[in-house]
Amino acid sequence: MQKSLLAVLVAAGIGTTASAQKPTATAPKSYSAAGKQVQVYTTADNSQLRLSATDKLSFKEVGQPLETQPTVFVDPTHTFQTLVGIGAALTDASAETFAKLPKAQQQEFLQAYFSPSQGIGYTLGRTNINSCDFSSDTYTYVQDGDKELKTFSLKHDEKYKMPFIKQATAAAGGKLTLYVSPWSPPAWMKDTKNMLQGGKLLPEFRQSWADYYVKFIKAYEKAGIPVWGLTVQNEPMAKQKWESCIFTAEEERDFVKGFLGPTLKKGGLSDKKLIGWDHNRDLAFQRAATLFDDPEASKYFWGLGYHWYETWTGSGMQFDNLRRVHETYPDKHLVFTEGCVENFKFDNVQDWKLGERYGNSMINDFNAGTVAWTDWNILLDETGGPNHVGNFCYAPVIGDTRSGKLIYTNAYYYIGHFSKFVRPGARRIATASSRDVLQTTAFLNPDGKVAVVVMNQTDKEQPFQLWLKGQAAQATSRPHSIMTMVVN
């Protein structure tokens, strides 16, 4: 990308859309689109359109829609879950790449992601406890064998990760909803004596490991980084070549019920949102049933986290499993905790399918009841790393440390069609499409604006009408495009 992203967004008029937010949107008893305008923002393949203000539409009163009229129906009087936020993981790899960029590009990056007016307004973050694959080395915060955690120190994180998180928080207006996840306990706490290649937490170290979470959260907060929540274990059913640890559903339930939950409570951290599973959609229902059907375990869990990598088995994305969880446990919250496109190749950073995978997932995940959506690495370098086991992947923004430039993939813009226009406190509202080529979701923001996202993954343009309570506005979805239609 040759031109500064900020200049592109301002030129498109996007810098004028931010407004003061109320805590939570309230469903209106009635709604009329009469007299309202629709500002359309578009990102489309084979064009220069990237979150560009493209059309301004008006509503007209219409009668019964016909089957021959492609229509996106929206009803703001029917509301569902409340959005916590949209964002990404601030990993060691992201922090190290950020530190290698020139100061001007660092500031561009921070505004591009975290400014709601000049960027795409991220409000959510995730970071790792101990090392993960997207670290340059394997590390923990204690010396080997220190069961009482007397040697606990954040010295490793103080070099890159913590300053990075603090700058991101400042760029987000001083508030970032941050949650934390471990990939593995220290090697000496495991049956394999290895942080990599799976293995299990030894029973005699369950209390020490529970204490470890509390130590980490309190140390981060003492250092000026508030922590909103935590997951129990990243990908607990995967034996990976990187940091990993296996927990069956019963083992996770019993660890939380007997150790982690009570330890958080004893440590004064009961307000932290505890999220179970943190793995793929395929086994999500079975995990939820095991964790939430036990009242002594369930009382500690705020929600269930999930990833999108179930496709490694040859399956498609299993969104219906999320619906089963939401239907069965409506008091628990669904959180998308990780997703990226793997097998990085620099020549493919502008592959349009990158963005479409995000758009497809986000629309379906939100429609299934998801309250928070977290991309994987927020920034990676020109190799798709750094990564200490060679597991390179794509990030929406690539920091080319050779040239010092930022490369914005179309995934950045696709995510921005949600994060920029659907703000924390927004309520998902009823929406339906009369054509399967038009995927859609919609939200009512705290400021009263309605944001409707419409995506077209086909090679053909699709005219349609946006229909709200007997009022319709005429629009066209371009081939391989995503639109956000802001009704005000």
Model-inferred region functions:
Residues 1-28:
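Bacterial Sec-dependent N-terminal signal peptides
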Residues 51-227, 248, 258:
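N-terminal catalytic cores of secreted or lumenal carbohydrate-active enzymes
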Residues 65-75, 162-164, 215, 258-259, ...:
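Alpha-helical scaffolding within the catalytic cores
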Residues 88, 121, 178, 230, ...:
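Conserved, mostly hydrophobic/aromatic
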Residues 208-227, 236-342:
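Active-site neighborhood of glycoside hydrolase catalytic domains
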Residues 333-414, 430-433:
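Aromatic/acidic polysaccharide-binding cleft in carbohydrate-active enzymes
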Residues 476-488:
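C-terminal beta-strand-rich structural cap/linker in extracellular carbohydrate-active enzymes
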